[in-house]
Amino acid sequence: MPNKYIVVTGGVLSSVGKGTLVASIGMLLKRRGYNVTAVKIDPYINVDAGTMNPYMHGEVFVTEDGAETDLDLGHYERFMDVNMTKYNNITAGKVYFEVIKKEREGKYLGQTVQIIPHVTDQIKDMIRYASKINNAEITLVEIGGTVGDIESLPFLEAVRQLKLEEGEDNVIFVHIALVEYLSVTGELKTKPLQHSVQELRRIGIQPDFIVGRATLPLDDETRRKIALFTNVKVDHIVSSYDVETSYEVPIILESQKLVSKILSRLKLEDRQVDLTDWISFVNNIKGINSKKTINIALVGKYTKLKDSYISIKEAIYHASAYIGVRPKLIWIESTDLESDTKNLNEILGNVNGIIVLPGFGSRGAEGKIKAIKYAREHNIPFLGICFGFQLSIVEFARDVLGLSEANSTEINPNTKDPVITLLDEQKNVTQLGGTMRLGAQKIILKEGTIAYQLYGKKVVYERHRHRYEVNPKYVDILEDAGLVVSGISENGLVEIIELPSNKFFVATQAHPEFKSRPTNPSPIYLGFIRAVASL
């Protein structure tokens, strides 16, 4: 069968839920037996998300093959249970880089290189290649930003051309836009949505489906009004409204038969779909079957924007739903723990578990170390991720080994005891973008340890994103003092450490949250939540 494409655009404002919509449609298609992938288009000039501030962009999601990508790829993976690749995130930076490289190589044979056709052709080539490399029958394409943004215009033109080239029944458009509810008048206002569709039609794109994003379900009158002014069938107007968890969205869409209608429009067979396990998971997330509520402190330096740690948050929810407890997340800015006037007991005294989050740089590091010490000394279940792992080593070296000046060379290049140091392969690296130790790496687990018990096997693969490692010169004295190295890389890097004397004290250089799935939680997060819940 010919490749099929579902292009999702957004209107009125950003963060309206395009990523969740794409992930939900993808999940419902996959559960019908179709091979599906999803492509996120980001119109910014950055080549990737790797050097962007989390406050600007949210989490940097790392794929199995080591790409630093938009957090929407995390939504795709979690909902669809399909691994994304570096080809699934297309940025304007990547597109222009390839076009300029081809021009320098003489590939355009002396032509004047222009947005049309050269840039738009490159965009289409990259979309098609992502579909091909993932063996997809159906490819979802999410165009970041909103219709009308100047940065998005070449991408919208490219997908307009894609429909012309691939055929009327092989490329369809789904447009999602805000439908604002005015509490004063008690009505849903559709005018902004209408204008966003008018803008799309000016570009030459007629939506096949419209998803109205509102606080409440769309009533029949509102749907008829939208249909009239957008030239879209009434039964192709779908409602996406506020719910307790984004994992409910596929259930809402399925109840309105959106995917069945999409398959009909694409001239594809509709198939039976079983959402029993998903509905059970959603009920557990909502706490319907919860045995108890647990308080988890998340200590980091970007906690004012929760999306900076979205995969960790979701991994906690997955593990909690799996064992039937409801997590209450307490976000703590690590800099708030650095002041001597703050009483750690007041902040951490009522939590059942502590996670020290990833991050870079010296800001807030001492606050994280205080949280780690508090967890270790008060025997509170603890999980350290990436930088949290490295600072666990620093804390242990200072407070157990008595190396009071121990530190990471990232924080203090001249530290007397550099227990964390730059990876050998990083010492001659001068560029920041795409140069860390990235992607899935082999971890060899030590039998008889907590890590081995959690994973249930000797060799595992987890994703990474770091430049620093535990200094091999200090491993022996750390182990002599009671720290257990339970996981190492093929070349001997320390990957996982634990303290068997504590209820649960585990830290890892990896990011196991990136591989956590709703119905298949990360083993490390599952072990942590079990310890927190005392189950």
Swiss-Prot record:
Top-level lineage group: Archaea
Q: In which pathway does it act?
A: Pyrimidine metabolism; CTP biosynthesis via de novo pathway; CTP from UDP: step 2/2
Q: Which residues form the Glutamine amidotransferase type-1 domain?
A: 302-535
Q: What class of enzyme is it?
A: ligase
Might you give the EC number(s) for this enzyme? 6.3.4.2
How activity is controlled: the entry says: Allosterically activated by GTP, when glutamine is the substrate; GTP has no effect on the reaction when ammonia is the substrate. The allosteric effector GTP functions by stabilizing the protein conformation that binds the tetrahedral intermediate(s) formed during glutamine hydrolysis. Inhibited by the product CTP, via allosteric rather than competitive inhibition.
Reaction equation(s) it catalyzes: UTP + L-glutamine + ATP + H2O = CTP + L-glutamate + ADP + phosphate + 2 H(+); L-glutamine + H2O = L-glutamate + NH4(+); UTP + NH4(+) + ATP = CTP + ADP + phosphate + 2 H(+)
So where does ATP get bound?
Answer: S15, V16, G17, K18, G19, T20, D72, V243
Question: Which positions in this protein are listed as binding UTP?
Answer: S14, K189, T190, K191, P192, L193, Q194, K225
The UniProt annotation places CTP binding at S14, D149, I150, E151, K189, T190, K191, P192, L193, Q194, K225
Question: Which residues are recorded as binding Mg(2+)?
Answer: D72, E142
Region Amidoligase domain, annotated ranges: 1-268
Record keywords = ATP-binding, Glutamine amidotransferase, Ligase, Magnesium, Metal-binding, Nucleotide-binding, Pyrimidine biosynthesis
Q: What does this protein do?
A: Catalyzes the ATP-dependent amination of UTP to CTP with either L-glutamine or ammonia as the source of nitrogen. Regulates intracellular CTP levels through interactions with the four ribonucleotide triphosphates.
In which family does this protein belong, per the annotation? Answer: Belongs to the CTP synthase family.
Listed under subunit, the entry gives:
Homotetramer in the presence of ATP and UTP. The enzyme dissociates into homodimers in the absence of substrate nucleotides.
- What this protein is called in its record is CTP synthase
Name of the encoding gene = pyrG
